[in-house]
């Protein structure tokens, strides 16, 4: 309309463009991006009321492929393309494969995925297949797959390994911290997150320490990493030969980022906890029904661990806490479908429906 000005809102540009001065990218590199990052930090009022803490959820399941992996993958694939590599390779139980395949498709290069035998969340694998990844099942567990992937990348330089052992993955993943601090204006007292391969706790601690070194925050959080009880090598202090848990994304017996994760825990005066599958599923249902956030089981580990830490007195009432929700619940619909109630028909009658709802 003439005489009126319109307001133009610039879209989120993706994590490389948003934080380029804090990332190891060449001036002439063109980011391979799906506009990842910029995910919401959602207040959790019911969890806050229940615990006496101020809890926020960093909902990384709203990244383009449904998990936090996209932050690191935009960096890894951008780096591979800039170096002239022709393929990316990962060992994955799901989320990494989905992200690697999507970003490889975006870049126009080959993606190969090594998957272990056993339980795989098919929603994640379906994503990789749709993006054209070559899926290879290995007669072994995740750790066997990762060891093979490392060897392949070392022997064939045209292939880039894009698991979190690739340091540029960590660089991309640390940007979630920048967003959290930019939103809160400070660091939380405690940051809770699930721990599988341990790249994320490594990345988050790196982000916090960089902001602190630059004077952008005046405190550092304690890092609270939760592992599944059946896959808790960092809690036990030794590898787990046969990890087992319903939370497939953290079913890892020997984390690739073990050393740096322990450093993050020790330097932050943090803690590793183990949560049983029952505790993880209880948290999975709680966050969905109390806060309206649908998470995959591994993400619920951060909530389960936090509740245990609060009950045990390790997290003081009144603390500000951020929980990282690493993946979307749609990644693993089978777990949710196990709760499907039996459905009985009611008459085509408003009163009958209201009675069924228990409202009268």
Curated annotation (Swiss-Prot):
One Pfam match:
PALP
Name the EC number(s).
4.2.3.1
What domain of life?
A: Bacteria
What GO terms in the biological process aspect are recorded for it? isoleucine biosynthetic process; L-serine catabolic process; threonine biosynthetic process; threonine catabolic process
Per UniProt, where does pyridoxal 5'-phosphate bind? Answer: 95, 196-200, 326
**Range of residues in the leader sequence:** none
List modified residues, type N6-(pyridoxal phosphate)lysine.
69
Q: Sorted alphabetically, which keywords does the UniProt record give?
A: Amino-acid biosynthesis, Lyase, Pyridoxal phosphate, Threonine biosynthesis
Q: Which cofactor does it need?
A: pyridoxal 5'-phosphate
The record's annotation in Gene3D superfamilies points to: 3.40.50.1100
Q: Subunit arrangement? A: Homodimer.
What family is reported? Answer: Belongs to the threonine synthase family.
Instruction: Extract the NCBIfam families matched here.
Output: thrC
Q: What does this protein do?
A: Catalyzes the gamma-elimination of phosphate from L-phosphohomoserine and the beta-addition of water to produce L-threonine.
This one is known as Threonine synthase
Organism field: Mycobacterium leprae (strain TN)
Lineage of the source organism? Answer: Bacteria, Bacillati, Actinomycetota, Actinomycetes, Mycobacteriales
Q: Which gene encodes it?
A: thrC
């Amino acid at each position: 309309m003439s005489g009126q000005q319109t307001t133009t809102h610039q879209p989120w540009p993706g994590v490389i463009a948003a934080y380029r001065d804090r990332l190891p990218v060449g001036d002439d590199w063109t980011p391979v991006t799906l506009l990842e990052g910029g995910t919401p930090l959602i207040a959790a009022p019911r969890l806050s009321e229940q615990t006496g803490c101020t809890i926020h959820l960093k909902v990384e399941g709203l990244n383009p492929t449904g998990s936090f992996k996209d932050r690191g993958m935009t960096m890894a694939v951008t780096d591979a393309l800039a170096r002239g590599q022709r393929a990316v390779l990962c060992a994955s139980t799901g989320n990494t494969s989905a992200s690697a395949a999507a970003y490889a498709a975006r870049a126009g290069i080959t993606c190969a995925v090594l998957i272990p035998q056993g339980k795989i969340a098919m929603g994640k694998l379906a994503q990789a297949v749709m993006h054209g990844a070559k899926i290879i099942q290995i007669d072994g567990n995740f750790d066997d797959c990762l060891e093979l992937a490392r060897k392949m990348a070392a022997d064939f330089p045209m292939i880039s390994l894009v698991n979190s052992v690739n340091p540029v993955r960590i660089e991309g993943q640390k940007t979630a911290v920048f967003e959290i601090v930019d939103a809160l204006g400070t660091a939380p007292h405690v940051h809770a997150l699930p721990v599988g391969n341990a790249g994320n706790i490594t990345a988050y601690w790196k982000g916090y320490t960089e902001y602190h070194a630059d004077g952008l925050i005046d405190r550092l959080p304690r890092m609270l990493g939760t592992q599944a009880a059946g896959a808790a090598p960092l809690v036990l202090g030794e590898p787990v030969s046969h990890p087992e848990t319903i939370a497939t994304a953290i079913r890892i017996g020997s984390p690739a980022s073990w050393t740096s994760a322990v450093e993050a825990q020790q330097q932050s005066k943090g803690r590793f906890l183990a949560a049983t599958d029952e505790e993880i599923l209880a948290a999975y249902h709680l966050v969905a029904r109390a806060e309206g956030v649908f998470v995959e089981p591994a993400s619920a580990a951060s909530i389960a661990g936090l509740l245990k830490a609060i009950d045990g007195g390790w997290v003081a009432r009144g603390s500000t806490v951020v929980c990282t929700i690493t993946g979307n619940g749609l990644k693993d619909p089978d777990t949710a479908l196990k709760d499907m109630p039996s459905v009985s028909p009611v008459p085509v009658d408003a009163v009958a429906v209201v009675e069924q709802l228990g409202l009268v």
